[in-house]
Amino acid sequence: MRYFIYCLTYGGRLMKAFKIILKILLALVATLILVAAIYVAYVFISYYRIEDNLSLEVENRAEEDSAVLNKEYTIVSQNLGFGAYTADFTFFMDGGKESRARSKESVIDCIEAGAEKVGSFSPDFILFQEVDLDSTRSHHVDQYLMLQELFPEYSHTSAVNYDSPYLFYPFNSPHGASNSSIATFSNINMTSSLRRSLPITDSVTKLLDLDRCYSVTRIPVENGKELLLYNVHTSAYGSDDSVRTAQLTMLFEDMQSEYEKGNYIVCGGDFNHDFTGDSSLTLNGSETEYGWAQPFPDDLVPEGFTKCENYKDGEILPSCRNCDIPYEEGNYTIIVDGFFVSDNVECVVVENIQTGFEYSDHNPVVMTFKLK
C-alpha cells in the first residue's frame, strides 16, 4: 500500500514536470513562429523596386568640357567587392564561410588599395561596381564618399544598384542590410546620368534577391554628338537564364537605340558571365565549375557592336575568382568583366590587370579607345 501511494505521488510529480516542459517547448515554438512571421512581414513590407528612368545627380566639375575625336582615352572597370575581399576572404554565397568584411579598417584598406591601383592608370573614365553606401556587410563605410575624396578632380555620379532588407543569415553572423551602388567617374564633364532598372525574377525569391541596374552617363563630344558610358552589374546569384537574357536584351536594345542616333557607346562592368565564352576552360583546363559562370550569349550582341577581346599581347588573364576558398595561384578563375563598344568607337587594346586579388575578388580591366 505504501509503495502504491509512493508510485502515485512520484508519477504525479513526473506528469507535472512533463506538462511544464511541454508548455516551455510549446512557448519556444510559438515564439519562433512569431519571430519568423514578423520577419516575413518585415521583408514583404520593406520590399520595393527602385523606379526606372531615375535621373542621377552629377557632382563636381571636371577640367575638360567635351571629348574629341581620334584621341586615345583610357577607361577602367573595377568591381570593388564592397571592400571585403582580401585574398583570403571567402563568401558564404559562393560556398565559403564569411558574410561580412572582417573589420571597418579592412574595408577602408581594400577601397584605398583598389582606388590606388585604378588611379595608377591615369584613367579618363572609371566604372566602379559594388560600392557600398551604408551596408552591414561593410561596417557602414560610405565607399562612394571615399572615392570622391580619392578622385577629387573627376566629375562623378552614383546609382543605387540594390537596397535590400536585413538578411538574418548566416545565423551566427547575419549578412544584414545592403545598400550598394555603381559609380561612374569622368575627367570630362558629364551633362546627365540616368539609372535604368534591369528585369529580375518574378518569383517570391525576389523579396531577398538583389535589385539590379545599369547607369547611362552622357558626355559631350566636339562634333555635337554624345559619348554614352554604360556602367553595368548584372545578376549572378539565384538568376535563371531567362532573367539574364532579359537583362542583356534590355541593355543592348538601349545601346542600339542610342547608337542609331549617331552617339558613341562604351559599355563596361561586371557581366557575371564567362565574358569570352571559353575563359573558364582556357584558364582552368576544364569547363565551367559554377552555375553562375555561363558563357556570354554572343547571339544577343546587336549589329554595330563589338565585344572587346583584343587583349594585350594576346594574353587571356582572369578578372575574377570564385570565393569558396582563400585565393592562391591555381584556384578557379574566370573573366566576367569587360567592355563593349559601338562601331564608331575603336577599341585599341584591353588588359586584365593582375593584382593577386589582394583587395577585391575582381581585377581591374583597362581599355584604351578612340572615338572615330
Labelled PLM ranges:
Residues 74-80, 111-140, 185, 217-219, ...:
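Active-site beta-strand/loop signature of hydrolases that rely on acidic residues for catalysis
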